[in-house]
Every structure is written in C-alpha cells, then in structure tokens.
Amino acid sequence: MPRRGAHARRSAAEWRARSMLAIAAAGLGAVSVSHSLAYAMRFAAVERAHSLAPWDGRITALLSAKLSGPEASTADRRSADGLARQALQQDPTAVPAVATLGIDAQIRGATSTARRIFTYSEMLSRRDFRTRIWAIEDAVGRGDIPGALRNYDIALRTSRIAPDLLFPVLISAITDDKVRAALVRTLATRPAWGDQFIAYVSGNGPDASATARLFEALQQRGIAQSEGATAALVSRLLSGGKVEDAWRYYSSVHPGVDRRLSRDSEFVANLTNPSSFDWNLVGDSGILATIQRGERGGIFDFSVPPSLGGPLLEQTQWLPPGVYILEGHSIGVNQPDTTLPYWVLHCGEGRELGRVVVPASEQDNGRFVGRFRVPADCPIQHLTLMARATEQMTGTTGQINRVRLRPVGK
C-alpha cells in the first residue's frame, strides 16, 4: 500500500509538470505564430504588426519610418523619434530607425546632426532608400554633382522602386552641361540600370535636344543606344521641328552618312526598329511589304491586293536646296502604265515636289530614273514609294533591289 501511494504521488507530480510544459509550449507557439504573422504584415499593416510584436526592433523601426513621412506633423515626428530610439535599443542595426532620426533632424534644421546620423546609417547599410534620397539632396545642396550621382547609382542598383522615382528627377537635370557630363561618366561605367535609363530618357526626356547631346556624348564613349531608343529620340526631335539636332544625333549613330544622299540604297541595314531617317514600311492593312536580306544584298518586296493603293515604303530626308536624281532597279513589276507604282518626294507639310514612275521591269532591264527639285522653303522631305489601285486579279506586285537619291553630279 505505501508503494502504491508513493507511485500515485509521483504520477500526480509528473502530470502537473507535463501540464506546465504543455502550457509553456503552447504559449511559446502562440508567440512564435504571432511574431511570424507580424513580420509577414510589417509592410502592409505596420501598426498591426507592431501591436503583435512590439519587441521586434525591425518592425518598430518601420513604424517610425511611416510616422516620419513627408506629411508628418510635429507630433508625428516626436512619436517617430521615440519609436526610432526604442527600435535601436531593441536592434542596434535597424537602419530605418536611424534614417528616421536623420530625416527628423534635417526637418528641424539640424543639418550637421543629420549628416552624422546618416553617416552611421550608411555604415550599417548602403541599401536604405531614404538614406540615399537624403544623401542625393544633401549633395545637390552642396553643389556636389559627382556625389549626387554616386548616390543615384547606389539607389538605382539597390532599390527596385528607385527607377520609377529617380529617373524623372534625373532626366530633368540633363539640360545642365555639368550634370550631363557627369552623367555620361557614370553611364560609361555601364551600371546595371544604364540601358533602362537610356530607353526611358529617349522617349520621356523633357528636352529632346539635351537628350540628343547626352546620347552623342555616350556614342563618343562607345556606349551605343538600342535601335528603339535611337528611333524614339529621332522621332521626338523631328516632331518638335528640331531637324538639325535629329540629323546630328542620327549621324553620330551612323558615322559617314551624308544628308544629300538617301540611305541604305540596297536594303542591307536589316533594322528591327528603324528611325525616320531609315527605310520604314508604311503599308495599310492588307498590303504585304517586307525588306529581306539575301546573299547579294537586300530587297524590298511588295504585294498589293486589287483595288487597293497607298504608301508602301518611306524615308525622311534633310536635303539642301537643289536638283536631285532618283535612280534604282525593279524586279517583277508588270502593270498597265496607268497603275504602275511611283516614287514621290514631298515636303514636310505635304507639298509634292514631283514623281518618278517605276516602269515595267521588262523595260530598260528594270532601271528607273527621274529628277526632283528641292526649293529653299522645303527644309525636310519624305521620299515615298506609292502603289496605285488596279483591277488586275493579281493586284500590284514587285520588288525593288536598289534605289538611290543623290544630287546631280554626285
């Protein structure tokens, strides 16, 4: 009997111990789940996350950052500072808390204190976006262009949201010669964000001429732009009436071009995104037109359904006043004289300067030739191949394997 009593007492004690351990484990599990949930929602609902895990310095730091935003009141900033200090006691490496203290110090006008705080922030991490933004503004305020661009570079390499926020600011500054020169040096190092920036500025820069000067300087450094970026910038310059800037930039991409001559006379360029100064397919729906490359050069092939006509191929020109010869060679053109395709040169505002008919290819071995006179009041021109509607069942078909516009005597 005494043995059974002792066994019973031990069993009761053991069960009490096990119950206490189970309760403790459940409590720890609840804390763990609560912390995991808090960390998962730290960006979407930082206040709720902080209430679930007020001991987590990283979450406390994020709450301090939210309270110190651009629209924060004086009371908000006091609360943010208190949370930031608490966060650093909980986690001395909580960089957002350091940035909060630095920003609020700057807002109060304590610039030297802000610089000291942000220096510490940069020692902890180069990835904090608010630290980078402050550093950019501080460098700009001191006239330190290289320093500002260094921080742009760091921010753009370390933050996924940086391009959306910083590209518009950066392109607005390229009208300044010193900024543009420094930016060229930065882009010449080929940063990871360089191609994305070039594509962005080609279509979005507020000053297309400044963008052209930037791209020309990059060309001199061996930094080529994509066909799409080149085409976008040339189009912007031309639509803005800046023909000379457009041609200067185009000639930096294509050294040796002569404004008195059309380009790519044998269709060998093989461009995916041609600029206005290159050959462009301009046919309407239903018209089949392609530029194809072969072993002996390229060829322009076209097929137009019956009763349909219109432009097929076009290239923008910047010809000086004078007389010009258009000459070329066709293959497979076999139309009645009244429906033969023809080349037309017209001024930018639409005034026609003349036509050169493409005769049947069996005539003169496919050669065609004609003249245009460009007057002084026609600063920009468009050379276009036109198809005329025909009642023939086969429609209008043919190929052009060579065409050249040149001044008389050249």
Segments (PLM) and residue ranges:
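Structural register within alpha-helical repeat arrays
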Residues: 62-68, 100-101, 134-135, 166-170, ...
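Structural marker of alpha-solenoid helical repeat scaffolds
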Residues: 52, 90, 124, 158-159, ...
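Extracellular and organelle-lumenal recognition/adhesion modules and their flexible linkers in secreted
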Residues: 5, 14-43, 161, 184, ...
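Structural signature of tandem alpha-helical TPR/SEL1-like repeats
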Residues: 38-46, 71-83, 108-117, 143-147, ...
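Residue at a conserved register position within TPR or TPR-like alpha-solenoid repeats
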Residues: 67, 105, 139, 173-174, ...
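TPR alpha-solenoid repeat register
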Residues: 59, 97, 131, 165-166, ...
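Canonical positions in the second alpha-helix
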Residues: 49, 86-87, 120-121, 155, ...
